[in-house]
Curated annotation (Swiss-Prot):
Transmembrane segments annotated in the record for this chain: 31-51, 94-114, 136-156
Primary localization class, coarse: membrane
Other known facts: Partially overlaps EAF5.
Keywords associated with the record: Membrane, Signal, Transmembrane, Transmembrane helix
Membrane topology recorded in Swiss-Prot or TrEMBL: Multi-pass membrane protein
Signal peptide: 1-22
Protein name: Putative uncharacterized membrane protein YEL018C-A
Native source organism of the sequence: Saccharomyces cerevisiae (strain ATCC 204508 / S288c)
Subcellular location, record wording: Membrane
GO cellular component terms attached to this protein's record: membrane
Disulfide bonds: none
Amino acid sequence: MCGVVVVIVALVPADPLLPAFACGCSCDAPVFIPFFNISSSIILICSTCVFLNRSYFSSRSFSISCISKPCRLSCPSFSVVLYSGNKFLTMVRISLMPSFLFPFATLLCLLKFVSSLISKLFCISLVNLTSDIRRLFPIMLIPPPFLTSSSFLLEIKVCISCNTTNSLTSLSIYAFL
């Protein structure tokens, strides 16, 4: 299966109300459902949450959790987050997006990349910038030619912890299948 892959490096504030770029919806406080009790944690979260709050987790807990609130634009996705004690290890997020959202996603890929550069250069928060980007949605109406025959967007987000305690450095791979 052929596809187009876009790689983005983004600095994501750990804000529980930060709207997701792909789905355009906000996230309620996570509700975690523990299943096991071992020395690491795996968490499933809705794509509306591109953040993690370490205070939710105990040092020796393993849990699989999910946010039940659906995205307003019906963007099915899940995230797998691996913790070891209190240390954040990695997160992989997989999203499937309906094809009619591709015009938004394509330009948001570029906007997220630019915003990440601004954040890294000037150490500013993305919360206000996120609101500005969301107001640009009405002008994102023209799909790129290479997306016209596509039906799904596959996003794989891999996050690693950075030096600050309130943000995550993430690597997003967008595959248009």
